[in-house]
Amino acid sequence: MKHRRLLCVLVVLLACALPCFGKSNHGKIRVLIVDGFSNHDWRQTTLLLRGILESAGEFDVSVSTAPQDTAAAAWAAWRPHFAGYDVVIQTCNDYGNNGLLEGVTPAPQWPEAVKKDFVEFVRKGGGVYIFHAAENAFLGWKEYEEMVGLSWREADYGTAIRVSEEGRLMRIPPGVGGSTGHGPRSNVLVKRLGDDPIHAGLPRAWLSPDMEVYFYARGPAERVQVLAYARDSQPGQGMLWPVEWTTTYGKGRVYVSTYGHVWKGDVQPESMRCAAVETIIPRALEWLAGRPVTFPVAKDFPGVDAVSVREKIPSAF
């Protein structure tokens, strides 16, 4: 009898301890922002993201910043603990030799040990938000490119996906069409495609301010589920392209979007203060964490006639 009671106690203690490892089943969603290098203003991006998520109230946010020097020892010591989180927001971008420090090129990729940990995290069920220019990153890292699906690449690098005027997806093979690019930033009419949980309850279309629409994003393009699309502003082109999509990798979920352009010198840009963006980010994180998508659709969510830009993001500065 004593042994049986002891066994019951051990089972209860183990059950209580299990949520501490891997994904949490209740409580706040644990989010890790990974930053440290980009051609965009990664420092301000992190501050703005933290401000949005802390205001939402259901996220526990941490940050892991890549070393700010080129010493091998510093990089060897950098090892983000991905497994301790439900979702990783990846903001790093090494595209175009964007150095960590001024004048330092080429920009580094993550160390092999960090890459391995990241792949294992997603494969086992972790969620990843590929934030804006992180879609450009890590040319040649096969697993990362599979997760992202569509990246900033040359014309012959992979398949592109565009959307027809009737809302049908059209796959463009390598070498057909152009390399990835974008026209001038502008107020963009975003249209939903389908009825994904992230967009449930949202209008079918809305205006998003100061936005880039990437054309001819390319990659493996496997398991890509396009959630929303918009027309690019490139003169003489004006086709429809994905601006939000999801993929899967192993048991993990991945969400990619071009929302959130924060250029160097921008302060509290409209791209981040958009009511649509500040609604969709928490909803995407809920979905990535495997939770029900319950974050409310904002009363000031924009329609098709005007953008909806909020005041300064709280707690960010």
Model regions: which residues?
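Non-transmembrane alpha-helical segments in soluble domains
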Residues: 50, 119, 145, 199, ...
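An acidic, glycine-rich "communication" segment
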Residues: 130-234, 297-317
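Extracellular ligand-binding/catalytic regions of CAZymes and related secreted enzymes
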Residues: 24-29, 44, 55, 80-83, ...
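Bacterial N-terminal signal peptides
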Residues: 8-17
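Bacterial N-terminal signal peptides that target proteins for export
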Residues: 1-8
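Helical hinge/lid and interdomain linker segments adjacent to catalytic or ligand-binding clefts
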Residues: 28-138
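Short, solvent-exposed loop/turn segments at secondary-structure junctions
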Residues: 38-39, 94-96, 135-137, 204, ...
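Boundary at the C-terminal end of the N-terminal hydrophobic targeting segment
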Residues: 20-22
